[in-house]
Amino acid sequence: MDESNDKENEFGDSFLEDSGDITRTTEDEDEAPLEPRFKYERLEGESTLPFMKTATFTSIDLHDKFIAIGTASGLIYILDHHGYGNFDSVPPLKPHRCAVSKLKFDETGSYILSCANDSKLVVSGIGNDKLCCTVNIQVMPKSICFSPDFIRQQSGHCFIMGERNLVLYEKRLFQYKASNLYSGSERDGFIHCCSWNDNLIAFTNDTGTRVYERGTEKILTSVQPTHDVDRVRSSRCPPKHMWMSENTLVIGWADTVTVLKIKGNEGMRKGEIHHIFHVSMFISGISYLPKNGSDYELFLVGLQMEGEDFDDCASVMSTMTTLTAMESSATATLKTCVIRPLGLKDYELQSEDEIVNIRLSTHTLPYMIHGLGIPYLSTYFILTTKQIIMAVPYGPEDGIKWRLQYKLYTEAFEMAKEHADMLAKTDVSPKKVGRKIIEGYLESKKARVAASWLSSICGDCKEEWEWAVDRFHDAKMSTLLGDVLPDSKPRLDPSAYEKVLLASLFNNVKLFRRLVQTWSPDLYMTSTIIDQTQWRIQQISKSEDIEDVEEVEKILMDALAHLYLYERKYESALKILMICQDFQIFNVIDKHQLFDLVKDQISDLMNINSERALRLLLDNADSVEPSFVMAKINGQPKLQLAYLTKLMSRNEGIEFADKAVQLYADHEKKKLLPFLKKNVNYNVTKARKLCSDRGFVEETIFLLAKSGNHYEAVKMMVREYKNIEKVIAYCKDQNDRDLWIHLLEVVADFPTHFSQLIIEASNCLDPILIMDKLPDDVDIPNLSEALEKLLTDFTNYVELQQCCYDSTLNDLHVLTNNLMLASDKSVSVSLMTRCSLCSQVIMNTGQDMIPRKFNDIKVFKCGHIFHLTCSASEIDRRQMIEDGICIACSDNSDHVNV
């Protein structure tokens, strides 16, 4: 028993653990979050720059080539997009003595405009110092921006600065000239954000966002804030601007996103709000993801404020100081999201990420976070006080990993196949992703689903199929491979098929039998499977723990028989099939021509299926005599009858005709009469005696008639049937006058039938004879009507006969007259009449110009004319002419006869 337990543990499959659905649609019970659109990485050059570890970052701006970072110490560092800086060529700038609050590149990336609380506006050059300058002002600037054409000659080299007023600085000969574009009051608050696109300048203070048009020098439109600016102070949560194509301005302020579009020609422009909606965070940066056509998506960076004593994020923004923030339990979470605007106030959230690997202090507020992007480069940056994070769009490798993490296996595998060439050498190639999917389902106890994936994942790869077999074997789920394992293209090593067979042998015997029957024996070592099957059968027969032992043994015996057939051990296979009473034994005998091995077991074959056994016997009639078969099944008359029926349907076994009559009489009476009518090889006398003794009326009557004893047949029919119609029909078929007379004599004892017989026999007998046969002193029902009909029919018959005679005479007279007229008709003979034999003219003259005599021709009433000389050489035909027979008509008659 220890060996038994070991084998069961080796090949056993735990079906109870497999609760997975066979379909692939149910990937995970938990709904997966939105798929990220970005991954977040530190800059590569961060580790090479010492200042990155110590500096506090306060501002940032982007250009296609550079990143400019302002620090709390007043320094500005110029780095590339990967965080590397060449400080020998572009050393750090020191334009301010305090924290740099704002930075701005010009469009060419040649200059940087910066400001700080030291009341300075500084234009610094990057490899160019022609336009560098420092403007001292009386206020602390809150926002700055270059004009789009700052570097162009004769453009004025303008830039703007926002505090309470919006001031335009234009370069003159020796200094910058300041011009107020907008003057704000104290209640209007500070201008915390300004931007310049073409000739449109947008700026935002506490009263809203305005768009100023240069040239007309007027404000085109104003967008009011939708939040309470007294509670959400702009100093804590400053607004953000982003210009898009077609003069579209996106404003991110507090938790609101507004999309404003400037329409119309210069001088008649106006603003239209296309979208305005709220998001679940305080916005710190805004950019966009370009799409085809006019479609686009917005990329937002912000803080989500949470905490037990955090009632209203807005109130925190207005009242929180550094000290109160440190004491508050409100926590800030850095988040990004991608949204697609739909309607005026509706949007669709495409992705939402919480950046958990960022170190945020407990007093972090939205103004401390900056988010910028270069959309056409798909490059986005997030700046905190201590870190610079690059948001890189998800590639196929990242997308696959995320899908695998959330068990979105179908999507992961489809993406891996779509980018197979790109991912071939990575850890998310289609091959490796497929393995991870299988592993994931097996670990989740969903082995059936894993098995359903194998065809798609493994395909024609032999290595992958064999890996899957080993993996399922380790998980004790090998039986699930029975329906999916390929038997060709690819063909696996025999050990793979043997693992599945042995697992099913010990856990699912029905599957084992089916696999043995359907798989080619060339796929595995049949001798190994035979040994294990024999051992398993012995084990089952001794076990008391297995339910339905007999059924399990029968299934395994059936499978073992097929294995013996593969090994060409036909006697062993037939022995098992015979014991199991398996219908397939007949197919085996036919296929392998094994009749000689079972001809001594005909009776057993009959018990399995008599129809197939009989067919088998008849197909092998040359190998076994009918007498041998009849002797083998002597004690089974029904089988004998079935055998003889099949045998005689092939016109064989005539020596058993009398035996067949007896068997039909004993077991199939309904088929006896058809057999008697069809077969002619039985002894009629014996058959009649048998039927008579058994009281078979119809059969006895038939045999009496067949032996020629019609009188007895008629007499028995009248006596037994008591139905004169069948007797009359029989007499009509025989058409014997004496039989009718005999019938009249027999029916005389049955007066009720006599009237009907008189009517039917009137066409076959003389009425006078019928009248003579009428019984005396017997009351015959309906006799007068029958006699009346008899005489009427006879009278009609005589009249019809006379009419036919008269008609014949008239026809003869007419035909005779026509013949006489034809005989008396003359035949015209002219100079152009030709001989019917030689086709020469009858009356032609000879060379001596002497006409032929008329006795030289012969004319017949049929119209044919001959020269007597034309038939001189034909003695028989001459004799015909002399006898008055036309040669031409005789020839036509011969052709017709032929």
UniProtKB/Swiss-Prot annotation:
Species source reads Caenorhabditis briggsae
GO CC annotation terms, alphabetical: clathrin-coated vesicle; early endosome; endosome membrane; Golgi apparatus; HOPS complex; late endosome; lysosome
Q: Where is this region: Disordered?
A: 1-35
Q: Note the Pfam families from the entry.
A: Beta-prop_Vps41, TPR_Vps41, zf-RING_Vps41
Alphabetized, the UniProt keywords read: Apoptosis, Cytoplasmic vesicle, Endosome, Golgi apparatus, Lysosome, Membrane, Metal-binding, Protein transport, Transport, Zinc, Zinc-finger
Q: Give, as residue ranges, the zinc fingers classified RING-type.
A: 835-890
Subunit relationships = Probable component of the homotypic fusion and vacuole protein sorting (HOPS) complex consisting of the core class C Vps proteins vps-11, vps-16, vps-18, and which further associates with vps-33.1, vps-39 and vps-41.
What task does this protein carry out? Plays a role in vesicle-mediated protein trafficking to lysosomal compartments including the endocytic membrane transport pathways. Believed to act in part as a core component of the putative HOPS endosomal tethering complex which is proposed to be involved in the rab-5-to-rab-7 endosome conversion probably implicating sand-1, and via binding SNAREs and SNARE complexes to mediate tethering and docking events during SNARE-mediated membrane fusion.
Would you identify the family this protein belongs to, as annotated?
A: Belongs to the VPS41 family.
Top-level taxon in the UniProt lineage: Eukaryota
SUPFAM superfamilies named in the record = WD40 repeat-like (SSF50978)
Q: Tell me the compartments it is located in.
A: Endosome membrane; Late endosome; Lysosome; Golgi apparatus, trans-Golgi network
| InterPro entries, per database record | Clathrin_H-chain/VPS_repeat, TPR-like_helical_dom_sf, VPS41, Vps41/Vps8, WD40/YVTN_repeat-like_dom_sf, WD40_repeat_dom_sf, Znf_RING
Q: Per its record, what are the GO molecular function terms?
A: zinc ion binding
Output compositional bias ranges, type Basic and acidic residues: 1-10
Q: Where are the CHCR repeats?
A: 614-756
A single GO BP term for this record reads:
apoptotic process
Q: What is this protein called?
A: Vacuolar protein sorting-associated protein 41 homolog
